[in-house]
Swiss-Prot record:
It comes from Variovorax paradoxus (strain S110). Required for coenzyme pyrroloquinoline quinone (PQQ) biosynthesis. PQQ is probably formed by cross-linking a specific glutamate to a specific tyrosine residue and excising these residues from the peptide. Belongs to the PqqA family. This is Coenzyme PQQ synthesis protein A. It holds the Pfam family PqqA.
Amino acid sequence: MKWETPTATDLRFGFEITMYVSAR
């Protein structure tokens, strides 16, 4: 899944942070 839009990139970054915190 590759996103080019800045909004999608920011959303993906936030999603990774959420997954990281949930994985703790």
